[in-house]
Amino acid sequence: MAKKTNTRKRRQRKNVETGVAHIRSTFNNTIVTITDPHGNAISWASAGALGFKGSRKSTPFAAQMAAETAAKAAMEHGMKSIEVSVKGPGAGREAAIRSLQAVGLEVNMIKDVTPVPHNGCRPPKRRRV
């Protein structure tokens, strides 16, 4: 039987003018995903993927670098303007939005989509340091 050759689908260059930047900012990390208006991911970056480890992942600087990296990759696909949706209570929320603007993307709208429980699960206990 003949060997089956691996045919990998090459990543094609999408030409997307507008998109949505999803910023997920937790207490431990910040993840920035830039999608087209339908929700298909174009680029993403996170503080951990950029090499920040431990408590450095949760800093605003790490969030800024993650947003910058994701935005530059999206701009290679022709992105010019974005809507930003922010989720989570982390430290990198504002820093990520500011760095998206600084890279050269036009921010049309910022919305907070942090899930708020209607008295759902019990929250974690308070830290005593």
UniProtKB/Swiss-Prot annotation:
GO cellular component, one term: ribosome
PROSITE patterns, per the entry: RIBOSOMAL_S11 (PS00054)
Domain of life: Bacteria
Keywords: Ribonucleoprotein, Ribosomal protein, RNA-binding, rRNA-binding
Gene Ontology MF terms: rRNA binding; structural constituent of ribosome
GO biological process: translation
InterPro entries associated with the record: Ribosomal_uS11 (IPR001971), Ribosomal_uS11_bac-type (IPR019981), Ribosomal_uS11_CS (IPR018102), Ribosomal_uS11_sf (IPR036967)
Keyword RNA-binding: yes
Family, similarity comment: Belongs to the universal ribosomal protein uS11 family.
Assembly information from the UniProt record: Part of the 30S ribosomal subunit. Interacts with proteins S7 and S18. Binds to IF-3.
Annotated function: Located on the platform of the 30S subunit, it bridges several disparate RNA helices of the 16S rRNA. Forms part of the Shine-Dalgarno cleft in the 70S ribosome.
Protein name according to UniProt: Small ribosomal subunit protein uS11
